[in-house]
A protein has these predicted regions:
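Active-site-proximal beta-strand/loop segments in catalytic clefts of secreted hydrolases
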Residues: 34-37, 80, 106, 133
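Internal catalytic-core helix/loop-beta-alpha segment
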Residues: 59-110
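Short phosphate-binding/catalytic loops that engage adenosine nucleotides
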Residues: 124, 155
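Histidine-anchored nucleotide/phosphate-binding helix
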Residues: 19-26, 113-123
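Short acidic-hydrophobic, aromatic-tinged amphipathic segments that line or gate anion-handling sites
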Residues: 77-78, 156-158
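Active-site acidic carboxylates
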Residues: 1-76, 96, 129, 138, ...
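Conserved strand-to-helix beginnings and helix N-cap segments that scaffold or border functional pockets
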Residues: 88, 113-116, 140-144
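A short glycine-rich beta-strand->turn/loop micro-motif centered on a GG-aromatic cluster
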Residues: 102-106, 126-140
């Protein structure tokens, strides 16, 4: 997921966009975007109660894939939670050998780590990688903590 504006946007998030554009524009494989997508009732959900910052409300600014990445959109999967539990099924549906998976985006410490853990659990023998130069966390410290946690479960950090 890449959106660097909106209520959860940051300069650190905006700074990764050129790296992500370079990566996806030259990537020879399937690119799947997962996108945080909440409804108008967000503040009445468990996440809204624990993270009371209205963000990624469907069809509002901050929910869209940023303009710089729109030319490279192949597949977008909206998910109402931190991780996309359908991601393993979606990856398998392409009929390709799911032996190498690389993730990047926002937020390292929320969505990226959740999706990395989901795909690593679903494909334990796959090479799961996260490009740290194409990720940003809520804070630099939480970004690093997430990278360290992923490394501990054999997710390769680039």
């Amino acid at each position: 997921m890449i959106c660097f504006y909106g209520s959860l946007g940051s300069a650190h998030a905006a700074a990764i966009v050129p790296n992500v554009v370079k990566k996806v524009s030259s990537f020879d494989g399937t690119v799947i975007y997962t996108r945080d997508a909440h409804g108008a009732d967000y503040m009445h959900t468990q996440e809204g109660e624990k993270l009371p910052i209205i963000h990624c409300i469907k069809d509002t600014p901050g929910w869209e894939i940023c303009d710089e990445l729109k030319p490279y959109v192949q597949t977008v999967v909206d998910n109402p939670a931190f991780g996309c539990v359908d991601l393993p099924r979606i990856l398998s549906s392409y009929g390709e050998d799911v032996s190498r998976i690389e993730l990047c985006g926002l937020c390292t410490d929320i969505c990226v780590i959740s999706n990395a853990m989901i795909v690593k659990a679903a494909f334990p023998e796959a090479q799961v990688k996260v490009d740290s130069s194409c990720c940003a966390g809520v804070t630099k410290e939480s970004h690093q903590t997430a990278l360290d946690a992923m490394k501990a479960v054999q997710i390769e950090i680039l």
